[in-house]
C-alpha cells in the first residue's frame, strides 16, 4: 500500500501546480528546487513530500486530467473542442443511406419527412480458413 498524504500536502501541491505548471517537470529533484523557490515551507521533510506529490500529479496530468486541478492550457483546449462546429452537417444531407431495419424504425418513430435511401446490408463474410 502507498503512503497516506495529508490535506496540507495535497492542497499545497495542487496550488503549486496551478500556478507554476510551465516550470514543473516529471523529475523529483527539479520539482524539489522549484517548490523551494516558490513556497515558504518550514521543514525539509514537508518540502520533499510536497515535491514528491507534485511529481506524482505531473505524471498523472501527462496522461489525463486530474480532479481539482484546473490548468489554463487544458481549459483552452476543452473550450476549443466544445466550440467546434463541422463545416458540413451529417444531418443536412439530401439522401441518407440506411438499411431496411433502420428505415422501419424511423417509420415507427414517425420520421416520415426524412428522405432515406435503402442499402443492402452486407454481413461480414467468412473466408475459407482451410486452404
Swiss-Prot record:
Entry keyword set: Ribonucleoprotein, Ribosomal protein
Gene3D superfamilies, alphabetized: Ribosomal protein S17e-like
GO cellular component: cytosol; ribonucleoprotein complex; ribosome
Pfam families, alphabetized: Ribosomal_S17e
GO MF term set: structural constituent of ribosome
Entries under InterPro entries matching the protein: Ribosomal_eS17, Ribosomal_eS17_CS, Ribosomal_eS17_sf
GO biological process, one term: translation
Top-level lineage group: Eukaryota
Signal peptide: none
Family: Belongs to the eukaryotic ribosomal protein eS17 family.
Protein name: Small ribosomal subunit protein eS17
UniProt organism field: Anopheles gambiae (African malaria mosquito)
Lineage: Eukaryota, Metazoa, Ecdysozoa, Arthropoda, Hexapoda
Originating gene: RpS17
